[in-house]
Regions:
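Patatin-like phospholipase
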Residues: 1-18, 23-279
């Protein structure tokens, strides 16, 4: 999506992101040009699940028996962000960058506009029960998707009058629920935040001009599977270019791909495979 927008010379006045949107948003805000977007795409093309989600029996067991409130250590994700984020602090970004996290005690949406970029983004991407919350300024912060995966209210509060939303969408052609706890958690978060996005668009459409770039559909790749990232990036770029050619920036409709739907119908008695696997 981002590639196609940058190719057309579309440049934002500010960037607001939560969860994976915080990762992409912070990188793009630091390098808001075509070369930066190509570098970001190259990073995603080279990622594998173990680079972000280092699954292990010991960590999973400790989380399961209540010895720690998360399944995975954030070390690999922290190292990945440290290697690739182009700025050390959010306020150093070339385009104002705002990262949304959630206070795990109050549920409050927290907008981070300054401070250490790695820790801020790590907090926004800390999926509850998967990664531990991140302490910033005496607050325990977790995945911004809990408060608002597409933080329209935060962007409006920062003065935005026109919003271009780049949603992830959700896996709508899976033949069975994800088999791993991680995959199921990510799929559930995607469903939840996609539904909330539609609600937020309806809520704020009279307040600001909101344009939503249609996500890929059909989509048959699990959120925890990075092996198809290159294909998805290419598909999204092609789809977004076509959408732009058809006057997409002038549309105000919620894409059908964001509404509840599925391309695979489950039938009673159909085997779905195990859903209890913790790996």
């Amino acid at each position: 999506m981002l590639q196609a927008l940058v190719e057309r010379g579309i440049a934002p006045d500010l960037v607001v992101g939560a969860s994976v949107g915080a990762i992409n948003g912070a990188f793009f805000a630091g390098r808001p040009d075509r070369a930066g977007v190509e570098s970001l795409a190259a990073i995603w093309r080279g990622l594998r699940r173990g680079d972000v989600f280092p699954l292990g029996l010991v960590g999973g067991f400790l989380g399961f028996i209540g010895q720690r409130p998360h399944l995975l250590a954030p070390d690999r994700l922290r190292a990945l962000l440290g290697r690739h984020l182009p700025v050390a602090r959010l306020e150093e970004a070339k385009v104002p960058c705002h990262v949304i996290a959630t206070d795990v005690l109050s549920g409050e949406e927290v907008c981070l506009s300054s401070g250490a970029a790695v820790e801020s983004v790590l907090a926004s991407a800390a999926i509850p029960a998967i990664f531990p919350p991140v302490r910033i300024a005496d607050r325990q912060l977790s995945d911004g998707a809990l408060a608002s995966n597409t933080p329209l209210s935060a962007a409006l509060g920062l003065g935005a009058e026109r919003l271009i939303v780049l949603p992830t969408g959700f896996s709508c052609t899976l033949k069975h629920p994800p088999r791993s706890a991680l995959g199921m958690a990510l799929h559930a978060v995607n469903l939840m935040t996609t539904r909330q996005l539609v609600v937020d668009i309806d809520r704020f459409c009279s307040t600001a001009e909101i344009v939503v770039v249609p996500p890929l559909c059909p989509l048959n790749v699990s959120s925890s599977d990075f092996s198809h990232s290159g294909q998805l990036i290419d598909r999204a770029a092609k789809s977004t270019r076509r959408w732009l050619d058809e006057g997409g920036l002038s549309t105000r409709e919620v894409p059908g791909a964001l509404r509840p739907h599925a391309h695979h119908k489950w039938h009673p008695g159909q085997h779905t495979g195990p859903v209890h696997d913790l790996t």
